[in-house]
Amino acid sequence: MGITKKFLNLFKSGKAGGDEEEEWEEVRILERTAHYDNFLIALSEGDLDTRWSAVRSVGDLGEPFIGPLIGGLKDEYWIIRRGSADTLGKIGAPAVGPLIAAFQEPGEDVRQEIVRALQLIGEPAADPLTQALKHNHPLIRRGAVQALGVMCETRAVPGILESLKDPDSGVRQESAVALGRIGDPQAVGPLIETLNDAKESVRMAVMATLCSLGEPSILPLIRALTDPNDDIHRRATLALVTIGEPAVEILINTLGDQTPAIRKGSVEVLGQIGNTRAIPTIMDVLDDPERSVRIEAVKALAALGVPAIAPLMQAFREGDVMKRTSAMEALWMLGQPATTPLIMVLKDDQSDVRKRAALLLGEIGDQKAVDHLTGLLADQNVAVRREAFEALEMIKKRTAQ
């Protein structure tokens, strides 16, 4: 019989009919024997099988083995690290303090097992972990916030929000990740404020969390589009694009907002999301009083592609001056897909439509427009003939290149 098994038999045995005090006296005696020392040696220095047996066996024996089990979290073999974490989880509350202190170990593999043990312990670990958010060691603060996130400890949210301002970037990054795991909407505002963090890793974690929070993030992110800080604007845009479909309806509604920066940012995001449901509303923005908003609407419609051509052609023919001009720019940006619809209006009753269509076809430079433009050289309107000639010259030059 091996030393581990002998010890456990002695440790767990009780005399039939003996009282509890007598059994615990036997335990205390055993702790002073060489058997106990040898058991600790087996736990920390034995071969893989011996260490594994020891780790799996001491869960019911309690506090005396916390130290060696903490050491087991640093073992070279994953099976020992995982077994040590599971056993510490069984020991429970007495292991919480030593586990939190062990976060000072820099290894990610060790930290993962500490977090696992604390998660297994659960409720008794919550308050000590929350208090550890104020610890003077950054690795302990980082580990504490990571564990609270994995445990989805909602009561810790105020403390984790404060940790978004921690001087250590690792703590700030883990705080953003933890808030995503917990999923509390009250985190959205502070997270958006952290979009301009000095560290890219923190900014990326914040964006990922805002995206995972979904709908509660949308309106605050849209408001962030007005931020004068270009980095915040860019990251808010990227977050909204990543959220995607759930943001479309809200973005469409904000195209009527009184703030030009919100209209501009919203139409930009809609173009990048690429949902064609937004086309009719974006078309309305083509005659927005703000030039910057109109420019973004043009870009958005061009990005939306072929489905935008029909409404753009309608605006090209029937819109007011501002809307026609914006539609022309969008059609030019669309390029060759717009060639056939433009060829079709070369015979429009309105000379202005024919002239502008010829101009655009020249700018697009598609060879298949040549014959149709050549026919326009006999147009009764001199301005149309001139534009057709210029368009043909432009196409010829591009072909020569």
What is each of the regions a protein language model found here?
Residues 35-40:
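An edge-strand/N-cap motif at the start of beta-rich repeat modules
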Residues 46-47, 76-77, 106-107, 136-137, ...:
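Short inter-helical turns and helix N-cap capping residues of alpha-solenoid HEAT/ARM repeat scaffolds
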Residues 12-32, 49-63, 71, 79-93, ...:
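Structural detector for internal amphipathic alpha-helices that build alpha-solenoid repeat scaffolds
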Residues 1-15:
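Polybasic, Ser/Thr-rich amphipathic helices
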